[in-house]
């Protein structure tokens, strides 16, 4: 077999076949359009004819649309997915009792065929990825010998639980000796299913904002991340569920042990992911537990809940600091004297130059706010190189603002509750920006680099709930029409994306 590079396409030839063109992509495009037509028919039946609520139609719609996005944005088509696959593969080795490598450093055992496919696929979307998906998925693995490869560990940033769904999919594929492409796709399907179930539970638990949660769980960027090996599927799902539980506790002060245990677990999870940037969301706990106490509660007992909250907050902050201390120490120790123009901003710079830091934050908001909003609504797919038309994204934004005001599902907050929600979102937003400033941005830049809209998805349920207003009221019939409009726009996003690829 000889390999030659012609333009940007790889041509592989042997005595029996030749491929190097993308003519098969035309058939893929036609098939995708037919599938989208079936999707529109299904949603029209469920939403318009049957008049189903979001609790009833979310799972089939999210699963159907998620699988479409999984085929559209193929393996390695999501930012940093190769790293996520390796982390999930490491966990899969433990599930299958594969011994650790004896080489010092970050190395793992991997099936030779899986390693070869990983090396073959590029980061992003290109015709070879679709060729492998269409013609080499339903095969058995040809070479399952384990070889040692190096990988980048993410254990310092997230707990292993975020890779459990993908690791289960990888383990199933390896046990059944499935092809590398199908094995990777199984990992992505497991991640998608777990995310859909988490959002479904959030929708069922939330006393209000069910339509908002469902719409956020169907945004293109949300489904792209959910239908991949990225840890975003579990992180977004857990924080959506956490927000729903907080709203439930605010609306229904009666204690339910299972919900309290879930809140405790999710609060701990939030404290130990992504450097603690979502830690301010724990203010939602303070909001729901600082509710007016029961009138028959003894006065001394009324102090127990606030005291427990304060102690818990201190413990969670301590856990965050301990978990990420090596990373924080490295950021503090950055030497800016050697080459300040090519050195990343250290944490000490933020404290030593507060006015300059505020200036950088302001510049970031002015220069990058449209890009961030575009990314949040799903306008920058794959490795940020699939740009969706703004006209479609504006419709998504209008739909979110309307669905948060559906009659009987509109969030009702006191001024105190709105203040808690606003400060929790603002705090997380600032921490995300600061983390990218001291972890990615070089000192020759006057704005923060690397911020993506998907980083703010966990804040979206709480943030968009603040836009509930008595000036807008959407009845059920109109909400069904709004939902069907969203399904049509989702289909148009897929069509635009695939036309940009072929």
Where are these regions (language model features)?
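Transmembrane-helix motifs of polytopic, lipid-linked glycan transferases
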Residues: 40-44, 182-208
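Interfacial juxtamembrane loops and adjacent helix segments
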Residues: 95-186
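Short acidic/glycine- and proline-prone juxtamembrane loop motifs at membrane-interface regions
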Residues: 228-235
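Membrane-lumen/periplasm interface segments of multi-pass, membrane-embedded glycan/lipid transferases
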Residues: 25, 141, 318-407
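Single conserved hydrophobic/aromatic residue that forms the stacking wall/gate
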Residues: 1-12
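Perimembrane helix-loop-helix junctions
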Residues: 245-255, 278-313
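Membrane-interface alpha helices of multi-pass inner-membrane proteins
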Residues: 224, 259-275, 280-286
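Transmembrane-helix signature of polytopic, membrane-embedded enzymes
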Residues: 53, 178-181, 200-220
């Amino acid at each position: 077999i000889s390999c030659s590079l012609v333009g940007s396409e790889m041509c592989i030839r042997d005595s029996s076949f030749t491929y190097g063109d993308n003519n098969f992509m035309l058939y893929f495009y036609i098939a995708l359009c037919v599938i989208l037509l079936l999707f529109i028919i299904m949603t029209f039946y469920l939403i318009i004819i049957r008049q189903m609520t979001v609790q009833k139609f979310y799972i089939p719609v999210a699963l159907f649309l998620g699988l479409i996005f999984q085929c559209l944005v193929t393996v390695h088509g999501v930012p940093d997915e190769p790293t996520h696959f390796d982390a999930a593969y490491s966990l899969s080795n433990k599930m299958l009792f594969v011994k650790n490598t004896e080489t010092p450093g970050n190395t793992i055992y991997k099936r030779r065929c899986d390693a070869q496919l990983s090396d073959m696929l590029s980061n992003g979307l290109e015709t070879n990825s679709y060729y492998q998906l269409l013609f080499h998925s339903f095969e058995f693995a040809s070479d399952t010998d384990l070889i040692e490869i190096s990988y980048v560990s993410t254990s310092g940033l997230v707990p292993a639980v975020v890779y459990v769904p993908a690791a289960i999919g990888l383990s199933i594929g390896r046990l059944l000796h499935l092809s590398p492409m199908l094995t990777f796709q199984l990992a992505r399907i497991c991640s998608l299913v777990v995310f859909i179930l988490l959002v479904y539970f959030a929708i069922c638990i939330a006393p209000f904002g069910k339509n908002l949660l469902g719409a956020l769980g169907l945004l293109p960027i949300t489904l792209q991340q959910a239908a991949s090996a990225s840890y975003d599927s579990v992180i977004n799902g857990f924080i959506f569920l956490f927000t729903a539980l907080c709203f439930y506790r605010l609306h229904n002060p009666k204690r339910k042990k299972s919900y309290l245990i879930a809140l405790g677990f999710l609060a701990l999870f939030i404290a130990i992911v992504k450097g603690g940037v979502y830690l301010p969301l724990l203010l939602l706990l303070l909001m729901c537990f600082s509710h007016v106490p029961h009138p028959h509660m003894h006065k001394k007992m009324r102090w127990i809940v606030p005291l427990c909250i304060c102690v818990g907050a201190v413990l969670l902050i301590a856990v965050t600091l301990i978990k990420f201390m090596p990373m924080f120490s490295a950021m503090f120790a950055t030497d800016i004297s050697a080459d300040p123009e090519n050195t990343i901003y250290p944490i000490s710079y933020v404290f030593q130059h507060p006015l300059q830091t505020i200036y950088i934050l302001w510049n970031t908001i002015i220069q990058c706010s449209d890009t961030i909003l575009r990314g949040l609504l799903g306008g920058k797919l794959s490795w940020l190189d699939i740009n969706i038309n703004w006209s479609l994204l504006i419709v998504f934004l209008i739909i979110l603002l309307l669905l948060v005001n559906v009659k009987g599902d509109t969030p009702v907050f006191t001024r105190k509750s709105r203040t808690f929600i606003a400060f929790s979102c603002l705090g997380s937003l600032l921490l995300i920006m600061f983390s990218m400033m001291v972890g990615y941005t070089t000192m020759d830049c006057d704005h923060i680099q690397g911020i993506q809209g998907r980083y703010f998805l966990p804040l979206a349920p709480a943030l968009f709930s603040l836009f509930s207003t008595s000036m807008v009221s959407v009845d059920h019939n109109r909400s069904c029409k709004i939902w069907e409009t969203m399904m049509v726009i989702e289909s148009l996003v897929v069509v635009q994306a695939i036309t940009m690829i072929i």
